[in-house]
Amino acid sequence: MPRKGPAPRRPLVADPVYNSPLVTQLVNKILLRGKRQLAETLVYAALEGCREKSGTDPVVTLKRAMDNVKPTLEVRSRRVGGATYQVPVEVRPARATTLGLRWLVTYARARREKTMVERLMNELLDASNGLGAAVKRREDTHKMAESNKAFAHYRW
């Protein structure tokens, strides 16, 4: 095992248009096969669409969507004496943001709209209003943690 400890977290550079690290993270989640320019174009177009549809600042819409999607609890498998328990644990803030963005992008890709810009825009708007598949995923995760609360004493 390495003795140096974990690698330090590198700071995220805020994106040039909205000056927000959250938008940079969203671009990184959308990015496929190194095509950053395409990912940025998609995200900026989706955020502009959010501005037109909702009439509010797109970064505020994104933050509201993230607040509705970020989980506070999740379950982790823990093996105790031959049995595997689903143990509820609190989610660290950085992981909560990562999970929230991952779910937003995953469920945006699964939507039925024609273009990715429309899919991402509508998923963001739905999530900011407390609707959509990403919010449902968070509710399911919390429900799972709630139903396994009896195993919380196995936490590590």
Swiss-Prot record:
InterPro entries: Ribosomal_uS7, Ribosomal_uS7_bac/org-type, Ribosomal_uS7_CS, Ribosomal_uS7_dom, Ribosomal_uS7_dom_sf. GO terms for biological process: translation. GO terms for molecular function: rRNA binding; structural constituent of ribosome; tRNA binding. Keywords: Ribonucleoprotein, Ribosomal protein, RNA-binding, rRNA-binding, tRNA-binding. GO terms for cellular component: small ribosomal subunit. It comes from the Bacteria. Coiled coil: none annotated. One of the primary rRNA binding proteins, it binds directly to 16S rRNA where it nucleates assembly of the head domain of the 30S subunit. Is located at the subunit interface close to the decoding center, probably blocks exit of the E-site tRNA. Belongs to the universal ribosomal protein uS7 family. Part of the 30S ribosomal subunit. Contacts proteins S9 and S11. PANTHER family: RIBOSOMAL PROTEIN S7. This is Small ribosomal subunit protein uS7. It comes from Salinispora tropica (strain ATCC BAA-916 / DSM 44818 / JCM 13857 / NBRC 105044 / CNB-440).
